[in-house]
UniProtKB/Swiss-Prot annotation:
One of its GO terms (biological process) is cell division. One of its GO terms (cellular component) is nucleus. It comes from Schizosaccharomyces pombe (strain 972 / ATCC 24843) (Fission yeast). This is Anaphase-promoting complex subunit 10. Gene3D superfamilies: Galactose-binding domain-like. It holds the Pfam family ANAPC10. Belongs to the APC10 family. Keywords: Cell cycle, Cell division, Mitosis, Ubl conjugation pathway. The keyword ATP-binding does not apply. Component of the anaphase-promoting complex/cyclosome (APC/C), a cell cycle-regulated E3 ubiquitin-protein ligase complex that controls progression through mitosis and the G1 phase of the cell cycle. The APC/C is thought to confer substrate specificity and, in the presence of ubiquitin-conjugating E2 enzymes, it catalyzes the formation of protein-ubiquitin conjugates that are subsequently degraded by the 26S proteasome. Acts as a positive regulator of the anaphase promoting complex (APC)-cyclosome. Involved in G1 cell cycle arrest in response to nitrogen starvation. The keyword Transmembrane helix does not apply. The gene is apc10. Residues 2-187 form the DOC domain.
Length: 189
């Protein structure tokens, strides 16, 4: 059983790397809040990179997750790890993603139906913005319905993907030193 699970995890990781190649998760730059959480299953668990842990809502639907960035960011995907085989009626089936600069101007970006998901669900929100990217300060994920009419929800992981920006490396030889003091210290220790 453990070997089958490890093989499934490797396959999921490979598929995720292909679809998010050239993008980086920027979720660590945001403040995460939710409409409710069951004791012992806080929202921070969607950021722990462990598919065995999860956030669980506690209350009536819809359940919401708010992802607030300090600065405006340009995003391509909102990706969620959902596991129907383990969570059954706790697994979201209808998700609505909204975005804006704050709560006062949230606009619906897309509504997604997922059928018994097992693994990463990548929602290409960038398709609804300019130049293939969506500029936001705030993302709201609203869980409108669960499979089998379940009440509370489990979400195992969430990642927010933005384009990877390469910083040009400056070679030591390319730095134009002009003073004797700088030239004498231009070697790495």
């Amino acid at each position: 059983m453990a070997q089958i699970r490890q093989e499934a995890l490797k396959k999921q990781k490979s598929e995720t790397q292909k679809s998010t190649e050239g993008f980086v998760d920027i979720g660590n730059l945001a403040q995460w809040t939710c409409s409710s959480e069951k004791s012992g299953f806080p929202i921070r668990l969607v950021r722990d990179d462990n598919i065995d842990t999860y956030w669980q809502s506690d209350g009536s639907q819809p359940h919401t997750i708010h992802i607030k960035f300090v600065k405006r960011v340009s995003i391509k995907y909102v990706s969620m790890y959902l596991q129907y085989t383990l969570d059954e009626s706790y697994t979201p089936s209808t998700l609505r993603i909204s975005a804006g600069t704050g709560f006062q101007d949230l606009e619906i970006v897309t509504t997604v139906q997922v059928e018994e998901p097992t693994g990463w669900v990548h929602v290409p929100v960038g398709d609804f913005g300019r130049n293939g990217l969506l500029d936001v300060h705030l993302i709201q994920i609203k869980i409108l319905a669960n499979h089998q009419s379940g009440k509370d929800s489990h979400v195992r992981l969430i990642k927010i993907y933005a384009p990877e920006i390469e910083q040009p490396a400056i070679a030591v030889d390319e730095i134009p030193y002009t003073s004797l003091q700088f030239i004498s210290r231009n070697q790495l220790r």
